[in-house]
Amino acid sequence: VADKIDWYLANPLTRRERRLGRSPSAWARSFACEDVSVLIVCRGPIRMEAMDVLDEMGVARYGILLSDKDSIVYQQARAPELRRMDAARVHRVRDYSGATTAERAERVADIVAICKAHGYGYVFAGYGFMAESADFVAALEDAGLRFIGPCSHTQRAAGSKDEAKRTALAQGVS
């Protein structure tokens, strides 16, 4: 009987060495990111996927952010990402974005404070309301943090369709 092959694990397009620091190429090693520290600010499957990618890339220092609502729900759901996390890397905020402008500013300040207190230099927000907020990204940039995604200037320029079209044309991508 021939051995069964797990095509997902054997697929070189999805399963390959992603730790660039181990590459024989000096050029590839220059892109190594094992020394970055990331706070993941998104939910569910996207958070789990980000954790998997960071693990594959050799990023050992990352934490996740939970809202109070997530903290209650996830204790009942036994989310897989929480089962494998050191509790010191799970951080909480009241909610992710707040209902008012003042609450949003307070939440962003909470996220910045968590990053500073725990040594996270990067923030990954997946996609959606936080990842697409130029104000959120600008606040991170102003605090000396790096956002994994488009910078606030790009987000603002792309925020309006006609400005996005002009930006794309100016960059030669449309």
Predicted features, each with a name:
Residues 1-174:
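N-terminal beta-alpha lobe that positions the nucleotide/phosphoryl donor
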